[in-house]
């Protein structure tokens, strides 16, 4: 049974049902349907922590998908998997690729900021406050962009920007 049919989570089940309906009723070329099915299965595997399987599905979806907007979400999800695996440099590559195709993807900007902030925290722990400030400044820039696109989101980031004097 495909991963997309094994979900026990209500939201995952709902997504799977809606995705299957979309695949049946929305007129799409067979290649687009296959790409969407791989994307759906990748999301399902990812939600279950099956990251290797998720990546396989996402890579196959990327091979088939031609629409830049849709590709941006696949790339974003590949970035999420790499973030979950602690592979921050790889994650950043995929977030940047997603943003090249879809510059108004606030979640990619937010995750990029989170990685920059994390690297700033690491620099502090290593006794390098100058490098930390560079990372924190980069995080601030990405968060400002994300907040501009989604003003009601990223409240913790907004607070951090205000507290550190980087909001302006």
From Swiss-Prot:
Q: What is its main location?
A: plastid
Q: One GO CC term of this entry?
A: chloroplast thylakoid membrane
Q: Which Pfam families match?
A: TPR_1
What Gene3D superfamilies does the annotation carry?
Tetratricopeptide repeat domain (1.25.40.10)
Question: Which residues pair up as cystines?
Answer: none
Q: Name one GO biological process term.
A: photosynthesis
InterPro entries named in the record? PSI_Ycf3_assembly, TPR-like_helical_dom_sf, TPR_rpt, Ycf3/AcsC/BcsC/TPR_MFPF
Q: How does it sit in the membrane?
A: Peripheral membrane protein
Q: Which UniProt keywords apply?
A: Chloroplast, Membrane, Photosynthesis, Plastid, Repeat, Thylakoid, TPR repeat
Transmembrane among keywords: no
First and last residues of every TPR repeat:
35-68, 72-105, 120-153
Keyword Disulfide bond applies: no
What compartments host this protein? Plastid, Chloroplast thylakoid membrane
- Function summary: Essential for the assembly of the photosystem I (PSI) complex. May act as a chaperone-like factor to guide the assembly of the PSI subunits.
Q: Which NCBIfam families does the record cross-reference, listed alphabetically? A: PRK02603.1
Protein family according to the UniProt entry: Belongs to the Ycf3 family.
HAMAP family documented for this protein: Ycf3
Protein name per UniProt = Photosystem I assembly protein Ycf3
Q: Which species?
A: Gnetum parvifolium
